[in-house]
Amino acid sequence: MSTSSSASALGRRAGPLDGLIGEIDRALRVLSGAATAARPYPAQAPEAPDALSEREKRHAAGLMRVNHVGEVCAQALYRGQAAACREPAARALLREAAAEEVDHLAWCHERLRELGSRPSLLNPFWYTGSFALGVLASYAGVPRNLGFMAETERQVEAHLDGHLRTLPVQDQRSRDIVQKMKEDEAQHRASAERAGGVPLPAPVRGAMRAMSKVMTSTAYWL
């Protein structure tokens, strides 16, 4: 092979197959628990061995499993939206949000480990469905694509608020993680709105809430 053809091969643009391989690799990292956080772990409060009863520990683990599933879905959703988005600025915003959600994913996974529990057994299903939903949302156009992101974050904020109310008061480590996640979600929502995201129709918002309820109810146990 000539030098010029070698340079051409090395300098070629990534094609659809490269993108597909990249998405499969990311999905495997998310589902295997191999994803690592770029920011420090928010749970810095010391935890006494007997701080939580077995019942409280199971409840905290159920809530953190729900949060972990939410982050699995966020990864897939935003990657799906970005994969089908043709507007560079919107695509970059979606990928940036997905990258920050990796921190949440890793934090929830670590807290589940500390609580002696595990992620949802249905994570491959949640990831696949959310990625497909993200691709579909992207075809609605950039304003609604970003509006979908903003509404997702708004509903996640409300869901995290509920967890802060029901987590055991003495489970400060879980509470610190959830509080930091809530702050990040608010920033993601605001970024999507500033970038041109528009409010979604009421039926769409209602359908999103219904789907979220099914996911949270199932993930608490499985």
Curated annotation (Swiss-Prot):
Its cofactor is Fe cation. Gene3D superfamilies: 1.20.1260.10. GO terms for biological process: ubiquinone biosynthetic process. Fe cation 2 binds at E101, E153, E185, H188. GO terms for cellular component: plasma membrane. NCBIfam families: DMQ_monoox_COQ7. Belongs to the COQ7 family. This is 3-demethoxyubiquinol 3-hydroxylase. It comes from Bordetella pertussis (strain Tohama I / ATCC BAA-589 / NCTC 13251).
